[in-house]
Regions:
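General helical structural elements
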Residues: 6-9, 252-254
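Short S/T/G/P-rich N-terminal loop/turn motif that feeds into the first structured element of a domain
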Residues: 22-114, 119-266
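Positively charged n-region of N-terminal signal peptides that target proteins for export
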Residues: 1-5
Length: 266
């Protein structure tokens, strides 16, 4: 799961600062919204997302519309050429849905806020551009994330999604579980794109490697080979990763930091 994997192959309650976040459902749906700060509005956008958007998300969690809300800040790439400065990831308890004005108004009322839904949208649009929104299906979730973790998001071009998903579940899922158990990582997830979709899209699926710190992203893992052999005693390392290369192409890798999180209590 860390840089070693790249070499062998050639990414809720009130915000939590140190304790682990309750694990979202392993299967289901989530949305990913990409926001770009308007010129000279980076600080204002961060304040808006961590304050007003956080309160709205808390209201949506409290009313049961969503189960988890993540605010991810772009680490690499960043700057004017980066597509997203922030991602907001929302986990749903059932079928996915877009935030309607009625839902927004209900969340505002639930939290006892003084502004209206129209005020909220105007403030958001004054400091940011909503670049895109996508819907994904969660297929596998290993471990859990905490505030301050780093998310390595691996965007995959996958000709045959079923074959690739089956191989990831067979090979990488047990490895990810072992690395979480050994304290080498905080989590891993496997997700397929639902909408938008089609052959012209730049990627069809995403895996996310969750690291506990910046240094852990680049730290060597001398036990990786032994861990692989323990988990897969009947598989050969080289040919196993060669098969990964046949099943998918890593179109892009981005790095984000988990800045804020809300999850429903159980």
């Amino acid at each position: 799961m860390r840089v070693a994997r790249l070499l062998l192959c050639a990414v809720v309650a009130t915000a939590l600062s140190t304790t682990l976040v309750a694990q979202p459902a392993a299967t289901g749906y989530h949305s990913v919204a990409c926001f770009k700060a308007k010129p000279d509005s980076g600080a204002e956008l961060r304040k808006f997302l961590t304050e007003e958007s956080h309160k709205i998300a808390q209201g949506r969690v409290d009313t049961g519309l969503i189960t988890t809300w993540y605010l991810l800040r772009a680490v690499l790439p960043q700057g004017s050429s980066a597509e997203c400065d922030y991602l907001i990831v929302v986990m749903f308890p059932g079928a996915p849905h877009m935030l309607s004005q009625e839902d927004l108004t209900a969340a505002i009322k639930k939290e006892g806020l003084s502004f209206t839904a129209e005020d909220y949208v105007k403030r958001r649009n004054a400091v940011s551009t909503l670049v895109s929104v996508g819907i994904f299906q969660n297929l596998v979730l290993v471990g859990s994330a905490k505030k301050g973790d780093y998310f390595q998001v691996n965007y995959m071009k996958v000709p045959n999604v079923d074959d690739w998903v089956a191989y990831e579940k067979k090979v990488w899922k047990p490895l990810a579980e072992a690395m979480v158990k050994d304290g080498k990582a905080d989590g891993w997830s496997l997700n397929v794109r639902v909408l938008p979709n089609g052959s012209e899209q730049p990627f069809q699926a995403v895996t996310v490697d969750v690291f506990p710190s910046w240094d852990s992203i680049f730290a060597a893992d001398p036990q990786f080979v032994d861990r692989f052999r323990k988990v897969h005693p009947d598989m050969e390392l080289g040919t196993t990763f060669e098969q990964f290369e046949k099943l998918r192409t890593r179109a892009q890798i981005n790095l984000y930091e988990l800045e804020d999180v809300i999850t429903a209590t159980k």
